[in-house]
Amino acid sequence: MAVMIQVSELHFTTEDGVKVLEDIHLRVEQGELLYIVGPASSGKSLLLGLLGGQLPPQRGQILVHGRNVGRLSPERRLELRQRIGYLPQGFAPLSRTVHENVLFKLRSLGNFREQAEEKAILALEATGLIRLQGVEAAELSSLDRIRLGLALAVCDDPLLLLIDEPFEGLDANECGEACLLIDRLHTGHLTVVAATRGPLPDVARGQRIVRLVDGAVMES
């Protein structure tokens, strides 16, 4: 099986000398679903940002789809980022309808109008939002807002999907529904890495889980 992410000897230290990530080694196969679980301020969001090319590694190597993130030019890094779907923690949609949010994202990525319309409908169907496409995003429930964030992240057929705290603000049943949706999006070809404080819903049992503790990754 092809490798989507290969991290070797990754270190990251803040400007005031705090070691956040220390000697991280991580391998994610193409088409795999991985949960990274760790407490607040453990470096989960930072690790996702590094994997997504939002900033270069200070030390160590990150390969994404065979490309060395640390050696990419700013232009090439931007190209890579545009091929990665990302749902940030505390995602806030635009003050538009659900459909308009997705359409705006697709148009901003260079899709022509007709192509953007087709992709938007597919993304809304995949995330269970087609019935709410005309609803203002501000009126969505917490779970449906996560659905919209995922629709935005996958609408342009990314190589990789990175999700930061998808269960934040959800009750136990909603966490289970969000987890099942992530699993459905991953099924087939999409590689997914999701970071969360946990605990994971019961429906996540059987998925690969690593824990980020004291700056180090440990397989569960």
Name the predicted role of every residue range.
Residues 52:
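Helix-to-loop junction immediately C-terminal to a conserved catalytic motif
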Residues 60-70, 80:
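Conserved ABC transporter NBD signature motif
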Residues 90-100:
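Conserved catalytic motifs of ABC-family nucleotide-binding domains
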Residues 115-132:
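Conserved ABC ATPase "signature" region
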Residues 136-142:
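Conserved ABC ATPase signature
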Residues 150:
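Hydrophobic anchor residue at the start of the ABC signature
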Residues 161-165:
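Catalytic Walker B motif of ABC-type/P-loop ATPase nucleotide-binding domains
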